[in-house]
Amino acid sequence: VIDVNDEW
């Protein structure tokens, strides 16, 4: 799976 960090 592709897990991108979308906290920014």
Swiss-Prot record:
Tapetum of anthers. May play a structural role in the elaioplast, a tapetum-specific plastidial lipid organelle. This is Plastidial lipid-associated protein. It comes from Brassica napus. The lineage of its organism: Eukaryota, Viridiplantae, Streptophyta, Embryophyta, Tracheophyta.
